Amino acid sequence: DGKIKNEYKQADFIKLSVKKLNELGLRDKTKTKLTVPEIRSGGSLNVKNIEFKFNGIDEGLFFKNISFEMGKIYGIVGKNGKGKSTLLRCLVGCERKSKDEIYLDGKRLSKADRIKISSLVMQDVNHQLFTDSVIGEVGLGIKNAEIDYVEDILKKLDLYELKDCHPMSLSGGQKQRVVIASILCKDSKLLFFDEPTSGMDFYNMMNISNLINECKTNNNIIFIVSHDQEFLNSIADYIIYL
């Protein structure tokens, strides 16, 4: 039922301001420069050591003595193949080949310990859809008393009208928002997002940004891998460059 509301010649479209583009649900045409400060030490998640070697080569990930503060959002950026997604898996505890020593509030956490307190949104969200309805997926493990909160999240992500649909029947962007919604409803100490805004327009990108910010508390830490500099500028407290 879509309809054409405006038509622009190329020369006129190029002249549109960022504000006007955003009003149309479009992104900034220019390359955004990250303006948040780099990571600094101090916090309650302490990475004493992470070692991970890629198959067949000596290159890999090597981190020592890095601290992350509770109540902060960390953006992770770098070129393709630098190990951004691998770093997330190492921190979560689901990368079996990694050697690590990680502490939370002074207590050493095993891989199994970290998995229990972590939530992860992967790039391919098809691996994270398990139920036969959107509301069932987002509310999985949520008490009935909190169903109003689940429905509120669905409304904010334009998913409420799809709440009875099977998740696998949705578009790629809708599936992505379903998984993000399910993660935001969980009370995890460590939240990990791998390219959560890929392919999203400005409107949905800002919805995701606002919701993640709302979920930031003094009792959790959020890590976001993204090539979306506009998104990271809107949300990240610190940036990790790989």
PLM segments and residue spans:
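Conserved ABC ATPase signature
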Residues: H166-L170, Q174
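Helix-to-loop junction immediately C-terminal to a conserved catalytic motif
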Residues: V92
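H-loop/switch region of ABC-family ATPase nucleotide-binding domains
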Residues: S226-H227
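Conserved ABC ATPase "signature" region
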Residues: I147-L162
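Catalytic Walker B motif of ABC-type/P-loop ATPase nucleotide-binding domains
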Residues: L191-D194
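ABC-family nucleotide-binding domains
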Residues: D201
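The feature captures the beta-strand-to-loop junction immediately N-terminal to the Walker
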Residues: V77-K79
